[in-house]
Amino acid sequence: MKNAFLKTQLLPLRPLDESGSQWLKDITEQARKENLESLVSSLSNQGKQINFLNAVMTLSPFLREVLIANPSYLSPLLYVDIETRLSEIIEDITLIDKNKSIHETTLMAALRRKKREAHVLIALADLGGVFTYEISCAWLTRLGEAALGVALRFLLREAHDHGKINLSNREDPEKDCGLIILGMGKFGAGELNYSSDIDLIVFIDEMSPHVGNLSESIDVFSKMVRRLIRIIQERTAEGYVFRLDFRLRPDPGSTPLALPVRTALRYYEGRGQNWERAAMIKARPVAGDKSAGFNFLKELFPYVWRKYLDYAAIADIHSIKRQIHAYKNYDQISAYGHNIKLGRGGIREIEFFVQTQQLIAGGRFPQLRGRQTVAMLAELHRLGWISEKTRDSLVKSYAFLRNVEHRIQMLADEQTHILPIDVSQFTSVAYLMGYQETNSFICDLLKTLQVVEKHYAALFENEQELGLEIGNLVFTGEEDDPETLITLRRLGFERASDICRIMRTLHCGRYKSTQSAEARERLTELTPALLKAFGATKRADEVMLRFDSFLQGLPSGIQLFSLLQSNPSLLDMLVLIMGAAPRLAEIITHKPHVFDGMLDPTIFSELPTKTYLKNRLEYFLEGVISYEEILDHLRVFADEQRFLIGIRILNGAITGKKAGFAFTALADLIIAKTFATVQEEFSRLHGNIKGGRVGILGMGKLGSCELTAGSDVDLILLYEHDEDAEISDGGKPLYIFQYYTRLTQRLVAALSTLTSQGILYAVDLRLRPLGNKGPVAVSFEFFRKYYRKEAWIWEHLALTRARGIAGDLDFLQKLENEVYEIIAFSRNKKDVIKAVCEMHVLIGKGKPPENRWDLKRMPGGIMHLEFIAQFALITHVIVFQIGATTADILTQLPNSFLNQSFISDLHHAYGLYTNLSQIIRLCLNDALDLNNMPPGLSDLLLSSVGEPDLLRVEKLIEETGQLVYSIFKQVMKY
């Protein structure tokens, strides 16, 4: 027969200070109030047991507080051993629901009282050396199961009585109820630690005859689980029973608390992650329909235990290691503040050492399918997988670390695994471990951590590392790994917990891009490089959020992840897009197909000339015949090529001027092909006009080959026909004016209508004769007459940028010849100056600059450069050429017009503005705001102009604007 606990030889503990005697007096006083005379007498005696209690009171604030309030917990220990008393408590718990008058409030109170007593007794037995850590864990697990069981039985009976479910046996409500509760982690393994959460997953056996309508059952059982959480977890005046955690269930962010078995099986077989396989090793039915629970685990068997170790399985297992791996050069093992569970050399590494080898060999060796860590170490040795020395050192280390873990938690009954930084609290842990001074404890602790780390590091010593020794990157389960948070902050992330959540979501397979195991494997391998690259940006969290949005829209991720893994330069480019260019990031988020163009190895070596783009377009449209398909293909092609031109700008492969040529060449091709397609379809329906010819003039920046990303296109559609023509010759004939009006409208719709494949170009027809008051399609005769007799000078200025881009080639030549003749008119220079100045004032009032970075409308900005260039053309300072850019015109200005220094200044200003505006228009949808600038955009802008900071750039822009404006006023004598 075992001795009563308070008469047993207990481990001598060193007290923290001399306060223990006073605390014992407080217990004695409370015991006297409760008439516990035997206990009062015992506490008054001197002896090793009293000295033990004295020390405990100084070392554990939690135990001290509970014992002072509840000295009755000690009374039975005068007569019985702790295990006997614990058995009585467990029995009391299991019988609570037998009381027919029980209700939720009394159940909660009874559970909390019984649990608190058991909790204290287990701690005393553990600290006194009566229990090993294994026995303590077993009792804690039994306590958890008893509490869960009685609470669930109460809820099942209540639901049955209210007609929500139909039990087969009210007296034994768990039997065949169809509700499965699996204990996971340490609870499933029977290794619950002192202040542990209990990890649970709840399933519904939809095949059970007692589960009715599945949708209703999900609702009923999920509500039942919420009440179970309240009964067990909610803190009341009596405390709490256990904290419950249901986040290990499949896709916890989007699934109910109670999940149908078939749904779960589909998830595990199709989207189950590496860590979920490992987690299921310890899964065990702990409450509810246990028979159905064991059947579920049998069905899950092939997912967890793979019979043949193929390459995919090995990669899967390696992926777990990569997700949990603590890199060798990251930090140092320490004592104060070290995480005993998740830190280097900690409990998690021992558990992973075992679980990895279980996953590798458990499919072939049934002996390796056990749940308990120490037992599996023994089996690994027995099968020859590890040496006797490895087994013994890891068993010893595991015991030591579990004991340390328990004592950390006994300080304040908190689920923490971190050794205190506070010297007094750290000393308390050392003394609770039985040490008489801290140095010996620290020495043994560090030695243990180093032993574990050594075995863990050797687990896959020949495996290729991920290549970046940057620290812990653990994104398994639902908890944030403390060392991972440290790593993320070190990399440059401010909201490390949010980044962990994003990475867990990616690894969970909730997005299409990460649903396949192969994609998640590639992502795991890419993660260190990805996070390092994003962390190096100025606002890493914002960049990571954009990347997350991008992946949400990606239909498949494996190709992208593989591409980024094998092409670091592409990863750098993706990071640059996410960090500097919200507009491009938005494009690839909604149209991820544009990123396909990055597969082209010549992307940065070949400039996007018109010939280059024409060849690409012909190849892209090969075999595409129908009207809608051609338009959709054009939209996809335009999106991709605009994106790739933008990438070349970001990369520095092309200047702003060359980008203008490239964007314009693309627009020319797209508009010409769109018009040809529209015209063919229109002719099929309505026929043709006799002698009819159409030509389209590009105006504005399209005409002068200076388009930017996102530019509108200014167009004028002109036509001519035979004099005797009246109506088209098709099945649905139209009169001439109606015909060309509708043709123009069809063209505008084809270019500017937003479809699922995007939009080609926003179209502006306002530069046509009479603007919005005039017809959308203009006859050549009216055009000729208008510009020769009625047009304002500003319309002649605009005509200097006219260029034929689509339609009948002979007619386009005729149109351009007419433009040459109109520009060649003799004009009064003073009238032109007056018109330019009036327009300048009008624009300044109607559309003033938004800020200092409004490079177009600011004083001395792009608009003033264009005024100077257009003025020089229509006053014949230089010879007019169709398609000449503003830069070309400024370069050709003669010294008789401006001195060479001014001409050079204008040309330099245009280059500065063009480079900056191309980048800004590429990266942003809205005007640039220095207070809300994307993190990487400032670096791009600085790089483009060679300045060290944005204040210098602003100063440069301001000085350049002042210079240009002064030249403008000199030219206009204004």
Curated annotation (Swiss-Prot):
Residues covered by region (Adenylyl transferase): 468-974
Presence of keyword Cytoplasm: no
Record keyword Nucleotide-binding present: yes
A Pfam family hit: GlnD_UR_UTase
InterPro entries: GlnE (IPR023057), GlnE_rpt_dom (IPR005190), NT_sf (IPR043519), PII_UdlTrfase/GS_AdlTrfase (IPR013546)
GO biological process: regulation of glutamine family amino acid metabolic process
Annotated EC: 2.7.7.89, 2.7.7.42
Gene Ontology CC entries for this record: cytosol
UniProt GO MF annotations: [glutamate-ammonia-ligase] adenylyltransferase activity; [glutamine synthetase]-adenylyl-L-tyrosine phosphorylase activity; ATP binding; magnesium ion binding
Spans annotated as Adenylyl removase: 1-464
Cofactor requirement: Mg(2+)
Alphabetical UniProt keywords: ATP-binding, Magnesium, Multifunctional enzyme, Nucleotide-binding, Nucleotidyltransferase, Transferase
Catalytically driven reaction(s): [glutamine synthetase]-O(4)-(5'-adenylyl)-L-tyrosine + phosphate = [glutamine synthetase]-L-tyrosine + ADP; [glutamine synthetase]-L-tyrosine + ATP = [glutamine synthetase]-O(4)-(5'-adenylyl)-L-tyrosine + diphosphate
Cystine connections: none
Top-level EC class: transferase
CDD domains for this protein: NT_GlnE_GlnD_like
Reported function: Involved in the regulation of glutamine synthetase GlnA, a key enzyme in the process to assimilate ammonia. When cellular nitrogen levels are high, the C-terminal adenylyl transferase (AT) inactivates GlnA by covalent transfer of an adenylyl group from ATP to specific tyrosine residue of GlnA, thus reducing its activity. Conversely, when nitrogen levels are low, the N-terminal adenylyl removase (AR) activates GlnA by removing the adenylyl group by phosphorolysis, increasing its activity.
Family indicated by similarity: Belongs to the GlnE family.
PANTHER family xrefs: BIFUNCTIONAL GLUTAMINE SYNTHETASE ADENYLYLTRANSFERASE_ADENYLYL-REMOVING ENZYME (PTHR30621:SF0), GLUTAMINE SYNTHETASE ADENYLYLTRANSFERASE (PTHR30621)
HAMAP family: GlnE
Name by which UniProt lists this protein: Bifunctional glutamine synthetase adenylyltransferase/adenylyl-removing enzyme
Gene that produces this protein: glnE
